[in-house]
Amino acid sequence: MLPSAQAPSLLNPTDDFAALGNIAWLWMNSPMHRDWPVHLLARNTLAPIQLGQYILLRCNDVPVAYCSWALMDADTELSYVMAPSSLGGNAWNCGDRLWIIDWIAPFSRDDNRALRRALAERHPDSVGRSLRVRRGGDTARVKEYRGRALDAAAARAQLDRYHAELIAGLRASNGGYAPRGRGTA
């Protein structure tokens, strides 16, 4: 129990600890996450829990799916893409560029679809991106998403602008970076 002399917090420790436990349980059931070190669990979950930047879905009081996101500025986005482990502290909420950091739905495609719907409802007017790494792989690719209320053409224009800025930043910081897939910016 916390001492009564401690200043009150806007966070509810009981709810935060419960969320962390539910998320840890999902990590243990995820083929991709289960062998990751505990420090990655802390690094990737504590900030979004404290900031409320996550969705946790439950079915019959059992956690079935989880995602978290960061809202980055262009510089933080560049650092994150170059070194995903660089995400820390204020980087989780320093801009308006939505990046999905974790996506765990280990039990069914229905849970995955429900999580996608919940995220689209939570961010109806946003485009988002994520770094997607296949299990056992070491190369990430950028996946793109758009909210339900966002016009497809407006979303494409915004994503193309973000993509061009990211490619320019990567080239400037990494010399001969050459993107694969979508061509050059």
From Swiss-Prot:
GO biological process: killing of cells of another organism; toxin metabolic process
Subcellular location: Cytoplasm
Enzyme nomenclature, EC number: 2.3.1.-
Major enzyme class: transferase
Gene Ontology CC: cytoplasm
Keywords for this protein: Acyltransferase, Cytolysis, Cytoplasm, Transferase, Virulence
Effect of residue 30 to R/W: Abolished protein-lysine palmitoyltransferase activity and ability to activate CyaA
Main localisation: cytoplasm
InterPro entries, alphabetized: RTX_toxin-activating_protC_bac (IPR003996)
GO MF annotation: an example: ACP-dependent peptidyl-lysine N6-palmitoyltransferase activity
Keyword Transferase: yes
Domain of life: Bacteria
Consequence when changing residue 33 to S/D: Abolished protein-lysine palmitoyltransferase activity and ability to activate CyaA
Catalytic activity as recorded in UniProt: hexadecanoyl-[ACP] + L-lysyl-[protein] = N(6)-hexadecanoyl-L-lysyl-[protein] + holo-[ACP] + H(+); (9Z)-hexadecenoyl-[ACP] + L-lysyl-[protein] = N(6)-[(9Z)-hexadecenoyl]-L-lysyl-[protein] + holo-[ACP] + H(+)
Active site residues according to the UniProt entry: 33, 102
Family from the record: Belongs to the RTX toxin acyltransferase family.
Subunit structure: Homodimer.
Protein function: Protein-lysine palmitoyltransferase that catalyzes palmitoylation of the protoxin (CyaA) at two internal lysine residues, thereby converting it to the active toxin. Has strong preference for palmitoyl-CoA (hexadecanoyl-CoA) substrate, compared to other acyl-CoA substrates such as myristoyl-CoA (tetradecanoyl-CoA).
Name assigned to this protein: Protein-lysine palmitoyltransferase CyaC
Organism for this UniProt entry: Bordetella pertussis (strain Tohama I / ATCC BAA-589 / NCTC 13251)
Species lineage: Bacteria, Pseudomonadati, Pseudomonadota, Betaproteobacteria, Burkholderiales
